[in-house]
Structure formats: C-alpha cells, structure tokens
Amino acid sequence: MNSNLKLNEDETFEKVSELKIGNYVDCVFNKCDLNNFNLANFSFSQCEFIDCNLSNCDLKNTKLAEVSFESCKIMGVEFGVMNQFLIKLSFKECNLSFSSFYQMKLKKTWYMKCELEQVDFTETILSES
C-alpha cells in the first residue's frame, strides 16, 4: 500500500465512471464503467469488481492483491505492467479477450467460465490455476 495515497476502506462504488487515485481496501465496485481509465499507481486490496467495464485500462504499477472480478468486461488490458508483488486475482464469467498476462506469475489464479480469445499467456506461470 502506498502511504502517500488516500485510503478508501469498506466502501461501495455504484455505477461510477472515474475514481480518485488511492488505496482501496475491502471495497466493492458494482456496474462501474472504467473503460479506457488510467488506473496507474492505484492500489486495490481485498476488493470485488462486479459487472464492471475495465477494458483498455492502464494498469501500470497498479497493485491488485486478493481482488476478484465477476461478470466484468476486461478486454485489451496489459496486466504485465502491474506491480506484481502479492498479486492474487480471480476471474468469474469475465471477458478477458485480447488482454495480456505476458511473463506474469499467476499461481492459483481462477479463470472460471471466462472468455479468453487471443489472450497472451506467453511465459506466464499458471501453476495451480
């Protein structure tokens, strides 16, 4: 967690289309449209994204620790540029088409009933996924 950023804890965000840079802990994002949004340097810990559009988001140096995505559209996202320290993700019924997980270590990552058309898993470690 970046101590210089605002802490947002135990909050629910409904149908938002932008977020302020910060640390988000135990938050729920429901039906948010963050298509093409710059999430660089954000931090999300123990958060849930439900029915959100995160397509083409910039995740440069973004932290995702124990984050779940359900029924989300996450197309064309470059996950490999994230901060990969303590990364733990799960995806259920998401569209991840045209995204890239190039050279990531994604042990025990769940991809349940997801659309994965032309996803780049080159040199990705997916053991126990």
Regions found by a protein language model. Name each.
Residues 1-129:
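Tandem repeat scaffolds
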